[in-house]
């Protein structure tokens, strides 16, 4: 289960925990320190500071999900990696022989989607592991 600490990732965590509980599976919680995000912010704040801040974000995000999973009686492994998110997620899932990937979608539309793409979309296109995506609560409200 990849997380970025967002509301969408938290919603996806609920689904991941439920799925793991129903199938007596363990949960791997992954946070990726995005190199692109680091390089965009580095000129203003410095690479080391950015990486440290994102590492702390990752520790908070993964521990919150791990605590929820543990409360449901699930074994949990947390990991923080650096790189391009879609590549890291795909590689990690293959390395741990994941049965599934559950992740949120960020709901990018228009020019943002064209320029930035979708991590979930890239994961789906590049992995053989089944992927379940969970829409952001904001996306669901927009559809109503």
What label would you give each PLM region?
Residues 26-28, 77-79, 132:
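A structural signal for isolated positions on well-ordered beta-strands in alpha/beta enzyme cores
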């Amino acid at each position: 289960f990849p997380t970025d600490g967002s509301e969408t990732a938290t919603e996806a965590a609920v689904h991941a925990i439920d799925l793991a509980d129903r199938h007596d599976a363990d949960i791997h919680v992954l946070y990726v320190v995005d190199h692109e995000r680091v390089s965009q912010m580095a000129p203003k704040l410095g690479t080391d500071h950015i990486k440290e801040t994102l590492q702390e974000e990752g520790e908070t995000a993964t521990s919150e999900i791990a605590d929820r999973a543990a409360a449901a009686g699930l074994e949990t492994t947390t990991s923080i990696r650096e790189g391009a998110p879609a590549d890291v997620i795909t590689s990690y899932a293959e390395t741990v022989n994941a049965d599934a990937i559950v992740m949120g979608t960020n709901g990018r539309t228009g020019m943002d989607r064209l320029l930035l793409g979708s991590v979930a979309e890239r994961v789906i296109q590049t992995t053989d592991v089944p992927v379940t995506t969970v829409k952001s609560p904001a996306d669901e409200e927009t559809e109503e």
